[in-house]
């Protein structure tokens, strides 16, 4: 029960950051920046949801059991092995999505009013969102480790810091990189 508030706040970080980015995006391309950020974030969220969150959710009960048993060595080894396995999956996926951001967006969205310019700005956002995959993976595994140890304070602090970093980076990058800067702010704040 004591973990409820920190867990709730931690799960709100990504939607809060997206809302912040969307607010900044509303000033770009006569409002089309909002669509670019949201469409790119949808693709990004599906990919990290399938891979990162699946791994994090599978590992949590095991970490909880090890924490209850006070098996510190296995706990640490499991976290290390999970981070290594995730890196093995996430780094190539990150690079692949960066390289293929334009074709992915074009295949999925380009039709009707979603023209080549929309593909260009949305793929730019997806390119930079992709950089956040490794950080998102690490953050999710380490948060689960803290929760398994009944420590909600660190993920809560991490979430609050993430939101602050995202705001600062949005302010600094939106003028220089438009939707790419907003997506990069989100990626770096993971």
What would you call each of these model-derived segments?
Residues 1-190:
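Membrane-embedded alpha-helical bundles of multi-pass transporters/translocases
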């Amino acid at each position: 029960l004591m973990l409820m508030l920190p867990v709730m706040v931690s799960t709100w970080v990504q939607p809060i950051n997206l809302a912040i980015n969307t607010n900044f995006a509303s000033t770009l391309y006569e409002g089309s920046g909002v669509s670019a950020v949201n469409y790119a974030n949808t693709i990004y969220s599906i990919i990290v949801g399938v891979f990162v969150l699946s791994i994090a959710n599978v590992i949590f009960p095991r970490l909880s059991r090890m924490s209850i048993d006070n098996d510190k060595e296995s706990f640490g080894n499991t976290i290390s092995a999970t981070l290594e396995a995730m890196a093995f999956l996430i780094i190539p996926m990150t690079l692949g999505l960066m390289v293929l951001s334009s074709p992915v967006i074009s295949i999925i969205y380009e039709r009707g009013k979603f023209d080549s310019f929309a593909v260009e700005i949305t793929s730019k956002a997806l390119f930079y969102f992709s950089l956040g995959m490794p950080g998102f993976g690490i953050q999710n595994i380490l948060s689960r480790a803290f929760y398994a140890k009944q420590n909600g304070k660190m993920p809560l602090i991490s979430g609050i810091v993430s939101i602050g970093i995202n705001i600062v980076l949005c302010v600094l990058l939106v003028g220089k990189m438009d939707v790419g800067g907003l997506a990069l702010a989100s990626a770096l704040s993971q």
